[in-house]
Structure formats: C-alpha cells, structure tokens
C-alpha cells in the first residue's frame, strides 16, 4: 500500500517510509492512497479473534511492506506479556442492557494513549531499519500530562530507541511528575523546564 501527503497527492511512499518520517517533507500528513475494503464475511471472521490476532489482520492491510514476522513483533511486543490488565486488551463492559463502554485504560499507565504508544516504538524501529538502516531513533516529547508517562513506558527498553520527555515543572500534577521521574528503563530520560507546555514544545 502507498501513502500520500494531505498537501500533495503526487507524493507516494511505503508505510515504513511514512512511519519513519512521521510527516511529509511538505508538512502534510501521510494518509493511505486508498482504504482497504472488508466484506461482512471478513468482519465476521475477525469477531472471534483475539485482540492481537485482529490487530495483525488489520495492520497487514495497511502495512503491506511489513512481513508477517515484523507485524507479529510489533503487535505481540505491544500487547503481549501481560502488559494490559485484561487479556482482551480493550474489553467492552456492559453497564446495563443496551449500554456498553469500551475500556481503553487497561494499559500499563492506565491512559488511553497506551493503546498506540505501546506499539509505536516497535513500528518505528522496524520502519527505520527497513528505510535507513540500523540508526538509533531519538524521540523528543513535550507533555503536560498523560502523554509523557505513556510514551516513556512505550519506549522503555525498546532496542534502537531513546526518548526524552520535556514537561513544565509547574504544569503537571504531582502524580504525573512522580510517574515520569520514577520511570524505569535504560533508554528513557525526563527534563522539567521552567515555563508552560508551549515552552516545552519549543
């Protein structure tokens, strides 16, 4: 599958290139040239799959330049090893008849951002390896809350990556500060800055 830029439809890159670059050189976002179509039978077949199996199936439609082994590394690394407090990863909980909620807080930091940030580092390392070789990827993050801890936890000890999170010293809760400053991992760092979130971004 090819990806194009929201600012220039003549751009055409692989999914690995889009992930490794983050944004297009023209400042646009990468989007799929076309959205894969699933039949009702395809959707029904996924209903009984585990979250991990379903994720591999859906990602294979969008990341066509990834091998099954690479997809397994990304998905199983993100959602395996009891990282989530439910084996369903994102279970649906019935409140009462006809009312259900999707629980997106079952990840290691109890933030919905765990859903993406547990997989992103693995997608990035595979994508960088496929496009530019074995370079180390350094991620700089600015946060005013949950993103920092979720990003640190996601990138923790993922080979080929380092992450540095900036946060406003007076702009996060005491709990969030403790979560970030006590983060384990050999490739993670945090830095408090004087100022607000906008200052952290610059």
Residue ranges and their predicted role:
Residues 1-202:
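PLP-dependent amino-acid enzyme catalytic core
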């Amino acid at each position: 599958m090819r990806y194009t830029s929201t600012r220039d439809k003549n751009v055409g890159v692989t999914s690995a290139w889009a992930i490794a670059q983050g944004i297009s050189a023209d400042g646009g976002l990468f989007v799929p040239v076309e959205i894969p179509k699933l039949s009702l039978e395809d959707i029904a077949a996924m209903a009984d799959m585990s979250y991990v199996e379903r994720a591999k199936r859906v990602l294979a439609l969008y990341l066509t330049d990834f091998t099954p082994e690479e997809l397994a590394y990304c998905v199983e690394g993100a959602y395996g090893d009891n990282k989530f407090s439910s084996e369903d990863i994102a279970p649906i909980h019935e409140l009462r008849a006809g009312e259900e909620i999707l629980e997106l807080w079952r990840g290691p930091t109890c933030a919905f951002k765990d859903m993406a940030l547990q997989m992103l580092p693995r997608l990035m390392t595979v994508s960088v390896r496929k496009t530019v070789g074995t370079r180390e990827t350094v991620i700089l993050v600015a946060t005013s809350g949950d993103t920092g801890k979720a990003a640190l936890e996601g990138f923790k000890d993922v080979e080929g990556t380092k992450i540095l999170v900036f946060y406003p010293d007076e702009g996060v809760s005491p709990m969030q500060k403790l979560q970030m400053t006590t983060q384990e991992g050999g490739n993670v760092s945090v830095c408090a800055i004087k100022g607000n979130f906008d200052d952290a971004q610059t």
